[in-house]
Amino acid sequence: MASHVRLDGRKTTETRPIAISFDKLARADGSARFSFGETTALASFSGPIEVRLASELPSKATFEVHLRPLSGVSAADAKSLSSAIRSSLEPSLFLNKAPRTLAQLVIQSLSPSRGASWGDSLSAAVINASSLAIVNAASIPMRGIVCAVAIGSLSDGTLVLDPTDAETAKLRGTGCFAFMFADDIGEAGTEIDCVWTSWRSIVGGYDEKELLRAKEVARVGARTVYSAIKKSIQGAILGVGTAEQTRDEIMKTDESESSDDDEKMII
Amino acid sequence: MATVTTPITPLPPAPTSKLNHLSQDEQDALKAAVFQRLHPRAYLEKFLAEDVRPDGRSFDGFRDVSVNVGSISTADGSALVRMGNTTVVCGVKAEIAEPELDKEEEGFLVPNLDLPAMCSPKFKSGPPSEEAQVLSDRLNQALLASNLLPLKTLCIEKGKAVWVLYVDATCINYDGNAFDATLLAMVAALRNTTLPKATYNPEIDQTLCSRKTPRVPLKLSPSLPISMSFGIFDSKFVLADPTSFEEPLLDTTISIILGDSNQIVSVSQFGSTMLTVEEDGQDTRRDALAECIEVAKARRAEVANEIFT
């Protein structure tokens, strides 16, 4: 299985080259661009900002995610993905630190979505760009960083990380996994928590073992994404000055988590 | 000298005194209902601490399901599903259309779920809510992933005419877990669907259906997808088949779709599945996904026996 060679010469457990840039969209609090090879997404984050009265929440910030495809208006598939993104990023944010406000994430896909639905690698790029934009804004304290990768299963059972469009046509099963990475929590060092699973068969079904195997391969893949993200933050933001705060806020998770529990009990 | 021990003053007459015309049981029920409205989280926590859910189910208990097929005579196939109080009605309507140029032999399957204002005060009238759109898209993905209806079987004449199946579901009473109920209704409705015999006539470039020849059922794959959903509350409790009261309080939702012989068609999980369990005074964390899959397998067999045999 390990000897499987892919069309572009990658190993099965290798993603396409990851590129990260912070675009400094002038009117947003934070923005970032993330790509796996050609698959690119651009995310912008604003918050805490004023919230519409109808969606105001008394105990936490309202978290909105808007996803725009490369062409046309966003349809049901984009709505579905944006709700998945919201639920996978929400565990990483301390939204209760800014009640009665709005945290708004707008993501623009810079790659065409294949056919009727968003590809899994595009979904992964979208999530990674979103995490980076929120870190770049540094306005909402975070528990960890959510990183996602796409994964596919070939007809012989080989799992391939970050499948390209050409490979996707031959897949038997496909999916996307997102993990939340939090450094310095507990004794185990980095804590990794799966926050989004979407694993579907294309031909026939699969069994539990394959799901767990896929999740493990994805976990390793997500770790490479995490290192890339960490490196980009250290390189691009820490030099700027204000970003000291970002890092502090990410690191402060221990304290914030305990205070979060207190609040839960009061509510 | 004044008396030292004052008798305990009775509690000031609570506003409930207006409710004196009600029996004690009715007053208690009213108090519980008010508590549930004002503090839904605390209300649920109190039940779960006693190892039971507000509706009397165990944590991994599903609600009773009943399916009634063919009740809409104007549709080509239909089903009505009740899952506890959640009621979904689904009708299949067939039309003839031209196929897409790059998929000349494939028909179309268009599932849609409507959550009208009628089914719950949660929903507003007007254009489909975000929740309805998200559910419709997930249902579409589930039907595609399970390959229940191979789209090539909907071909009438290659490149000229194919069937379009509109699988429209409407929720008429919403009490949570609409996804499971709707998928069940759609599968049951597709099983109930029959199509007239259609022939394409190249001379007049039209497709003709005959009323005289008997209608034929769809060529469905024998592996019927059934979805089982779970929710995680407070990183501690895994609740199967959540109701509309439990749903907004959940941190995580998991949907597991199983086909025949427990083949997994799709697993989707939104939020973390790690549970914090107290063991020997220490908090340990474990993943709940594997146990959900086990519960789902047992449940799939039950539902399939009851409904699809």
Residue spans of the language-model regions?
Chain A
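Polyanion-binding surfaces on beta-sheet-dominated domains and ring/shell assemblies
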Residues: M1-I267
